[in-house]
Amino acid sequence: MNKERRKALNELKFKLESISFELENIYDEIESLKNEEQEYLDNIPENLQNSQRAERSQEIIDYLEDTIEYLEDSKSQLQNTIINLESALEE
C-alpha cells in the first residue's frame, strides 16, 4: 500500500475510533437514564402501580433496553470494522 492510501486509511480509522468513543458515551447516558426510570418505577406507590403513568414508565424502560441492545450490536460491529482496518494497515 502506498503512503497516500495508508494515510487515508489511518485517518478513517481515527474517525471510526472517535465514533466508537462517542457511541460508548451515548450508551452510558442511555443506560443511566434507563436506570433512573427503573428506580422511579420501582418506587411508585403500590396504589399507582397499575396506573397509566406506571405503564408508560415500563414502556420507556423496554424501549431503552432495546436501544441499549442495538447500541451493543453497533459497538461490536464498529470494533470489528476497526480491527479489519488495523489488519489492512499492517505491514
Task: Walk through the language-model features, giving the residues of each.
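Long, low-complexity or tandemly repetitive, helically biased scaffold regions used
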Residues: 2-91
